């Protein structure tokens, strides 16, 4: 699902965007593709090799598609969330001790909210982000800064 599902969706979207072309009254771009990745696109995760590998695959999928579709005025980017308060990671923040341990990985010292991701997606789909393509934007409170090295390693 992580990689194949996104490939199938973006393939069909790209076909439709190319068919329609740019419609200046709607947008500067013919289309915008937003992939969902994760901080594990760049942070290894032992014990979760299949997940981390699929997220690395999403990065290359998105970058290759961005390169291929840019001449058609189609932008492709990814959002790479860190810890977001959703049911899938509830066990990592079930108790105050577990949440404190999770927050040691997040320099900004808070778990993200689904609205954080939604707001970024809305912005990436807007003409305000028209010159951005082929990029993963990490929405992670600084997890990808590797906070364990903040004190000099």
Task: Mark where each language-model region is.
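Active-site "substrate specificity/gating" loop of NAD(P)-dependent dehydrogenases
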Residues: 44-48, 70, 148
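Active-site helix of classical SDR
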Residues: 10, 54, 62
